[in-house]
């Protein structure tokens, strides 16, 4: 389950107050995910209920978060289907909750799937292309925290969940990527923000 940090109703109610989005109706942990604690949150504002997603960041630091949250804000402002972070009354996109940085974002329609179809893949490809185009004028930058070094570090953890023949394919591909990362072509590739953990 992807709830590593537990929170109380009282903690969340206090944390939500500076966002001025309404009264807490309910919240529940989200079972999927591998890195952060995530919760569905329902708020009521003048009789109108709205669903959100709360993320408590377990790994990313307060210094790393602005890049990601500002990128999400940038892409959402261009009408891409990405979660939109909500700022508190002082403009902060994240604040501490249970001793860790946390952010509230819009809840997107849809659900995850463990059996993607070619249609799903085509939809993802379209949105990724739109994201890359929309991100060209995003000015912030930061090192790729989900680049090749991270992939190499995660390989053994991921391989533990894979059949042997698939784990072998993963290892082989990472070797190809390591070799490619040493080439002039790789170093000449354009740089920009992207969903590198995808």
Regions found by a protein language model. Give the residues of each.
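Short secondary-structure capping/turn segments at boundaries of alpha-helices and beta-strands
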Residues: 25-28, 37-40, 72
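Proline- and acidic/polar-enriched loop/turn elements at helix boundaries
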Residues: 28-29, 87-88, 143
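An alpha-helical support segment within catalytic cores of ATP-dependent transferases
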Residues: 8-18, 139-141, 152-197
């Amino acid at each position: 389950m992807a709830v590593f940090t537990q929170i109380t109703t009282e903690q969340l109610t206090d944390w939500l107050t500076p966002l001025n989005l309404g009264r807490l109706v309910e919240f529940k942990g989200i079972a999927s995910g591998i890195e952060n604690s995530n919760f569905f949150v329902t708020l009521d504002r003048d009789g109108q209920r709205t669903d959100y997603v709360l993320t408590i960041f377990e790994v990313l630091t307060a210094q790393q978060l602005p890049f990601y949250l500002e990128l999400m804000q940038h892409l959402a402002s261009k009408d891409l289907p990405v979660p939109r972070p909500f700022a508190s009354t002082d403009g902060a996109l994240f604040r501490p909750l249970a001793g860790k940085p946390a952010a509230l974002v819009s809840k997107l329609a849809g659900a995850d799937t463990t059996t993607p179809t070619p249609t799903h893949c085509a939809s993802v490809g379209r949105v990724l292309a739109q994201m890359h185009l929309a991100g060209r004028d995003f000015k912030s930058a930061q090192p790729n925290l989900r680049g090749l070094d991270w992939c190499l570090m995660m390989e053994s953890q991921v391989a533990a969940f894979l059949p042997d023949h698939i784990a072998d394919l993963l290892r082989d591909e990472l070797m190809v990527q390591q070799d490619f990362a040493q080439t002039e072509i790789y170093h000449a590739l354009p740089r920009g923000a992207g969903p590198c953990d995808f």
